[in-house]
Amino acid sequence: MNDSFDTLVDDVPIAKSSIHGQFVLKYFEGREKELDRIIEKGLERVKVAGRYTNKNGKPLYYPPGTVVPVRVGEKTFYLLALTHFRGNTVEPNMKIYYTAVLTLLEYLNKATAGAPVYIPLLGSGLARINREKENELANLLSILRMSRVKIVGGIHIVLHPDMRGKVNILRYRKNKSIL
């Protein structure tokens, strides 16, 4: 998700094809105001990092790694401030990416109570962190290893079916030391 937790999916700045856009459309289409209220409540105690002056969507933005839990039925989704904008374009930044993922892991370590955690390949696609899917996976696994945070139920990285053939999963399954 972006650092202003936008809920308007109109392809500027939130694309329908992004994980962010797909989440909003699948679980809150037509109920974006409800999601806005949940997000606002989740951000009540978070200090605003700044204000956008030239971006469509919400003007306030929050620190990288800010997490807002959103309960949908029996599932809890953890919305993550991962991307920052320059105008209406995502500004790729590895430092923000690393900070956000490490902060997410620390949050999940406290919040998940031993439940397994499923995360998408963060930074793929529209976040423009890395164009090569193999490198994105290697980066994410590297952060998981460096963090030393142990999620009791395990962390499962979910890859979109379109990534078949773009990521050599066997390379990582064989080398358990990466995790």
Q: Which residues are covered by each model-predicted region?
A:
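Macrodomain-like recognition of ADP-ribose-binding/processing modules
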Residues: 1-179
